[in-house]
Amino acid sequence: MTTFNNLPSIFVPLVGLVFPAIAMASLFLHIQKNKIF
């Protein structure tokens, strides 16, 4: 149960870092794709 209680403290910063990184990467690729055409 201790691992289950400690899971949110690891999972929340991970999601907080991963989701903006994916959003930034997709936005960057979208801009790069628009520059080529």
Curated annotation (Swiss-Prot):
One of its GO terms (cellular component) is chloroplast thylakoid membrane. The chain crosses the membrane at residues 9-29. Keywords: Chloroplast, Membrane, Photosynthesis, Photosystem I, Plastid, Thylakoid, Transmembrane, Transmembrane helix. Its main location: plastid. GO terms for biological process: photosynthesis. The keyword Plastid applies. It holds the Pfam family PSI_8. InterPro entries: PSI_PsaI, PSI_PsaI_sf. It is a single-pass membrane protein. The keyword Ligase does not apply. It is found in: Plastid, Chloroplast thylakoid membrane. May help in the organization of the PsaL subunit. Belongs to the PsaI family. This is Photosystem I reaction center subunit VIII. The lineage of its organism: Eukaryota, Viridiplantae, Streptophyta, Embryophyta, Tracheophyta. The gene is psaI.
